[in-house]
Design a protein with these regions (language model features):
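Alpha-helical recognition segments enriched in aromatics with Gly/Pro capping
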Residues: 260, 288-300, 407-410, 414-420, ...
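Acidic, turn-prone loop/beta-hairpin segments
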Residues: 82, 178, 185-190, 432, ...
C-alpha cells in the first residue's frame, strides 16, 4: 500500500467531496419511523464571498449535520442564498456609474434584468466556496429568496397579513438612508457612539419680551420646527405656555406647548419640535395637531421649505451655515461637547435621517405574544441562555416593522392602485377590474419589500409552502439554527413569529448563537480593516480540514473566536500528526498476515488501557456533540489521538508489531491499532471529514467494515465493559514512571541507545 510521505489535502478533499455528491450521501431518505435532524443555513447574500465568520458559522452547522448523519437519523441541511436587495442593487449601480449612467437612465425593467444577469454570472460564488469548506448540504434542495416558489410564499404572506389587518400603509417617521435612497427598519440601523456638539439656540418671543433657549444635536432640522415644548409642571415656563416664538430665518410663528414628553432637567428644559424629522417629535405633533414640514429631499438636500438661504445645500452644509448665521444674529448660545449614539445605514455607513414618509408596515405586537411564550417555556431554546433576556426585552418592546424599500431589486409589493379612482387592491396579479369604479387600468406599487421579509419565511418557504408538502410534514420544525447574535431581532425573532403565524409550529428547537471572529488584538475581522484573510487562500495552503479543526478547537460555545496563523498551525499540525501515525501504522501492519476476531485477542495492559480510554472518549465526544460543545469535543479528540494513542499506545505496541516470533501478540497489536484508529476517525469525521475518510478507507483494506463510506458510517457506541478505572490508574503509574526516567536520562545526557537498569523502590 503506497501512502504519500506528507499529507496533501487538496486532491484528497476534492476527491471525497465529489464522491459524497455523486453517491447522494447529503440527500436524506425519509423514514417515518425515525425523527429527522434538520438545519437551515442562514442564507448568505448572493453578493457575498466567504469570510471567516462564514467559516465558523457553517463549520458549526456541518459538524452537527455530519455527526447526526452518523447516528443513523435522516439529516437535512437546506442551503440557499439571499437576494440581498440593497447590497445587490448597489453592486450593479456601481457598474452603471462606471459607464456614466444611473438606474434612472436605463429604467426599472432594464436594471432588474441587468441584476438577474449579474446574479446568473457572478452571484452565488459563495456556494462553491462553501463546498470547498466541506459543507454537506443537500444541494438538490438549494433555494434562492427570489426563486419562483419563494416569491409565491412572499405574496401569499403579504396578502394574508393584509387581510388580517396586520399590514398597513401610512405616513410615519422612518429611518432613511440618503445614500441608498430607501427606508430602513430600526434593526438595520447601526448605532455608533460619537462625540458631537449640543448647540443651544435662542428663539425670540414674538412679543419681544425675550427669547427661549432650545438645545439640539441637529441644528439643520430647526427649519422644520412647528413648536417648542416645555413640561406642564415646569414652573419656569408656565407663563410662556400658549405664547409664540419667531423661528429664526423662516420667521414662522410657532407655539410654545406643554407636553410630558419633555425632561425638565435636560438642557434648558425646552425642546424644539420637528414632527417631520424626529420620531418622538412626530408623536408630540400628533397629540397637538402640529404641521409636519419636510425640509429636505430623499437625497438629504435641503428643499424650498428650508428657505432660500439654505435651499440646495446638503444637510451637513446646512448645519454649518445655520451655526454661522445664528452667530451673526447673536442667537447662538453655549456649545457643549455631547456624546451620543448616531444611526448609520448598515449597508453603506451613511448617517441616517429621520424622515416622514408614506411606507408599508407590519403590526408586530399581535404576533410577538406567542413568540415570547415559546422562548419563555423553553420550546425554543436560545443558547447560551444569556441571550434569552436580550430576546425578551426586544420582543416585549417591539415596534411595527417598516417593510417597504425604495429600490427596484427585490419582491415588488403586491399592491395595485386604480388609475381612475386610486382604489388600493392587494393581489398576487394585476387586477382585472376595479371594484369601485369599474376601471381596468392599474399601477403597481413602486416599492419592493425589505429583504428580511422573504428571509423570515425561510423555515417553511424552503419546504414548499404555501403548498402542502411531505417536507413540511416531516422536516418542520427544524432542529438547529446556528447564527450570530447580531441578527437575533432582524431574523431569528421574525422567523419564530412568522412560522407560528402560518404553520402553527415553531421554526426550530434550538438556536446556537456564536460569537465573532476577532484578530489577535481583539478587533472584529473585516476586509475593510484589512485584518481578514481570504479563507479560500487558507484552504488552498492548509486544507479545509485544518481550517475547520482550528476554528472549532479555538471557539468555546457562544464565545468569540480569536484568529491567528498560530491557531491555523494547530489544525495543520494535528492533520500531519494523524497522517504520520497512519502511514507508520499501515507500513507495518500490512506486513502482518491475518486478522484475529475480537474475542481471540491476547490483550495486554496497554491494549486494555487504550480501549478503556477510547470508550471514555466516545462517551465524552458524543456528550459534547449533543450539547453543542464542539470545541470541547475537538480538544478531547486531539488529546486522545495525539497524546494517548500516538505518543503512548503506538510506541508501546512497536515491540509486538516487530516481534514476528510472538504471532498472537503481533496480531493482537495489529487488531487494536487498526480498531482504535478507525474508531477515532469516526469520532473525528464531523470536524475533519476528508483526512478521516481517506484514512478510514485505507484501514478498511486490512480491517473489514460494512459501510461503504465514513460519511454514512455508524457513530461509535460506548462499550462500558472496556472502561476500567483500575487499568487507567495502573497505566498512569507506568506513564509517570517512564516520564521520570526519560527526564533523568536527559538531565545526565544519556544517549537513547544506552541501556540502563532501573530500580523502583
Amino acid at each position: 500500500m503506497e501512502i504519500n510521505k506528507s499529507y496533501e489535502p487538496q486532491n484528497i478533499e476534492k476527491k471525497w467531496y465529489e464522491n459524497s455528491i455523486k453517491n447522494g450521501y447529503f440527500t436524506p431518505k425519509k423514514d417515518k419511523n425515525k425523527k429527522p435532524y434538520t438545519v437551515l443555513i442562514p442564507p448568505p447574500n448572493v453578493t457575498g464571498i466567504l469570510h471567516m465568520g462564514h467559516v465558523l458559522n457553517n463549520t458549526l452547522q456541518d459538524v452537527m449535520i455530519r455527526y447526526k448523519r452518523m447516528t443513523g437519523v435522516p439529516t437535512l441541511w437546506i442551503p440557499g442564498v439571499d437576494h440581498a436587495g440593497i447590497a445587490t442593487q448597489n453592486v450593479v449601480e456601481k457598474q452603471l456609474a462606471n459607464d456614466g449612467k444611473t438606474r434612472h437612465d436605463i429604467g426599472r425593467e432594464k436594471l432588474v434584468d441587468r441584476i438577474w444577469d449579474w446574479k446568473e454570472e457572478k452571484g452565488g460564488r459563495i456556494i462553491e466556496q462553501l463546498k470547498q469548506l466541506g459543507c454537506s448540504c443537500d444541494w438538490t434542495r438549494e433555494r434562492f429568496t427570489m426563486d419562483e416558489g419563494l416569491s409565491e410564499s412572499v405574496k401569499e404572506v403579504f396578502i394574508q397579513l393584509h387581510q388580517k389587518g396586520l399590514i398597513y400603509k401610512g405616513k410615519r417617521i422612518i429611518n432613511w438612508c440618503p445614500r441608498c435612497v430607501t427606508a430602513l427598519a430600526n434593526d438595520e440601523v447601526d448605532h455608533k457612539d460619537e462625540t458631537g456638539n449640543l448647540w443651544n439656540m435662542n428663539y425670540p418671543l414674538k412679543d419681544g419680551s425675550g427669547f427661549i433657549t432650545v438645545a439640539t444635536t441637529r441644528p439643520e432640522t430647526m427649519l422644520g420646527d412647528t413648536a417648542v415644548a416645555v413640561h406642564p409642571d415646569d414652573e419656569r415656563y408656565k407663563e410662556l405656555i400658549g405664547k409664540t416664538v419667531l423661528l429664526p430665518f423662516i420667521e414662522r410663528e410657532i407655539p410654545i406647548i406643554a407636553d410630558e414628553y419633555v425632561e425638565k432637567d435636560f438642557g434648558s428644559g425646552c425642546v424644539k419640535i420637528t414632527p417631520a424629522h424626529d420620531p418622538n417629535d412626530f408623536e408630540v405633533g400628533q397629540r397637538h395637531n402640529l404641521e409636519k414640514i419636510i425640509i429636505m429631499d430623499e437625497h438629504g438636500i435641503m428643499n424650498e421649505k428650508a428657505g432660500k438661504i439654505f435651499e440646495g445645500l446638503t444637510r451637513f452644509e446646512c448645519r454649518e451655515k445655520i451655526i454661522e448665521q445664528l452667530k451673526a444674529k447673536d442667537l447662538l448660545g453655549e456649545i457643549e461637547p455631547h456624546d451620543h449614539a448616531v444611526g448609520h445605514c448598515y449597508r453603506c455607513d451613511t448617517v441616517i435621517e429621520s424622515y416622514l414618509s408614506d411606507q408599508w408596515f407590519v403590526k408586530m405586537e399581535p404576533m410577538a405574544k406567542r413568540a415570547i411564550e415559546v422562548v419563555k417555556s423553553g420550546e425554543v431554546q436560545l443558547q447560551p441562555k444569556r441571550w434569552i433576556k436580550v430576546y425578551l426585552h426586544w420582543m416585549e418592546n417591539i415596534r411595527d416593522w417598516c417593510i417597504s424599500r425604495q429600490i427596484w431589486w427585490g419582491h415588488r409589493i403586491p399592491a395595485y392602485y386604480c388609475d381612475e379612482c386610486g382604489e388600493l387592491i392587494v393581489a398576487k396579479e394585476t387586477p382585472v377590474k376595479c371594484n369601485q369604479c369599474g376601471n381596468t387600468k392599474f399601477t403597481q406599487d413602486e416599492d419592493v419589500l425589505d429583504t428580511w421579509f422573504s428571509s423570515w419565511l425561510w423555515p417553511f418557504s424552503t419546504m414548499g409552502w404555501p403548498e402542502k408538502t411531505e417536507d413540511l410534514d416531516y422536516f418542520l420544525p427544524t432542529d438547529l439554527l446556528v447564527t450570530a447574535p447580531g441578527i437575533i431581532y432582524l431574523w431569528v425573532a421574525r422567523m419564530i413569529m412568522a412560522t407560528l403565524e402560518f404553520q402553527d409550529k415553531i421554526p426550530f428547537k434550538t438556536v446556537l448563537l456564536h460569537g465573532m471572529v476577532l484578530d489577535e488584538t481583539g478587533m472584529k475581522m473585516s476586509k475593510s480593516l484589512g485584518n481578514s484573510p481570504d479563507p479560500i487562500h487558507i484552504i488552498e495552503e492548509y486544507g479545509a480540514d485544518a481550517l475547520r479543526f482550528s476554528m472549532i478547537f479555538n471557539t468555546p460555545k457562544g464565545a468569540d473566536s480569536y484568529y491567528s496563523n498560530s491557531i491555523l498551525d494547530i489544525g495543520r499540525n494535528f492533520a500531519n500528526k494523524i497522517w504520520n501515525a497512519y502511514r507508520f501504522m499501515m507500513m507495518n501492519v500490512e506486513k502482518i498476515d491475518g486478522l484475529p476476531n475480537k474475542d481471540e485477542l491476547k490483550l495486554e495492559l496497554a491494549d486494555k488501557w487504550i480501549y478503556s480510554r477510547l470508550n471514555e472518549v466516545i462517551r465524552l465526544t458524543q456528550k459534547n456533540y449533543e450539547e453543542l460543545r464542539l470545541n470541547d469535543a475537538a480538544n478531547i479528540l486531539m488529546d486522545f489521538i495525539w497524546k494517548e494513542f500516538c505518543s503512548w499506545y503506538l510506541e508501546l505496541s512497536k515491540d509486538r508489531i516487530y516481534n514476528s516470533e510472538d504471532k498472537e501478540g503481533q496480531l493482537t497489536a495489529k487488531y487494536v491499532l487498526l480498531d482504535v484508529f478507525q474508531t477515532s476517525m469516526r469520532l473525528l469525521q464531523p470536524i475533519m471529514p476528508f483526512i478521516t475518510e481517506e484514512i478510514w478507507h485505507g484501514i478498511k483494506e486490512y480491517f473489514p467494515m460494512p459501510e461503504e463510506s465514513l460519511v454514512i458510517a455508524e457513530f461509535p457506541k460506548v462499550d462500558n465493559n472496556f472502561i476500567d478505572e483500575k487499568i487507567d490508574k495502573d497505566m498512569t503509574l507506568i506513564q509517570e514512571t517512564i516520564t521520570v526516567i526519560r527526564t533523568l536520562r536527559k538531565q545526565v545526557n544519556l544517549a537513547p541507545k544506552v541501556e540502563i537498569e532501573i530500580f523502583i523502590k
